[in-house]
């Protein structure tokens, strides 16, 4: 049987390798450009998080009603609000475009550690 230290060392080195690969392939320099991220269904997420920051957080709400699509719908009643909360926290320091991209890339990197 392998000793615990060997298992931990191999696990840590494997995670560091995956993190290095992510850093090499992700364009970190583009994260800190203040523009709107696009691609896939990213626009839908931007609208929802922007509504969360501009309409809900000034009233200290986690969820509420949004008139952005479908003649109105309940926003964040049936959807996970943590990405919007994280973006709001980063938006206190960075512009919205940068805060959104930091949250997006942070979730990609943290997936490595959840495996």
What are these regions (language model features)?
Residues 25-115:
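Active-site lumenal/periplasmic loops and adjacent helix-entry segments of GT-C-fold
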Residues 1-29:
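Start-transfer (signal-anchor) and selected internal transmembrane alpha helices
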């Amino acid at each position: 049987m392998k000793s615990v230290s060997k298992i931990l060392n191999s696990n840590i080195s494997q995670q560091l390798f995956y993190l290095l690969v992510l850093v090499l392939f992700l364009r970190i320099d583009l994260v800190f450009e203040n523009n709107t991220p696009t691609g896939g269904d990213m626009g839908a997420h931007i609208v929802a998080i922007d509504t969360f920051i501009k309409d809900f957080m000034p009233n200290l709400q986690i969820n509420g009603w949004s008139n952005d699509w479908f003649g109105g719908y309940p926003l964040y009643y049936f959807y996970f609000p943590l990405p919007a909360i994280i973006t709001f926290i980063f938006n206190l320091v960075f512009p919205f475009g940068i805060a959104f991209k930091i949250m997006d890339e942070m979730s990609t990197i943290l997936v490595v550690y959840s495996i």
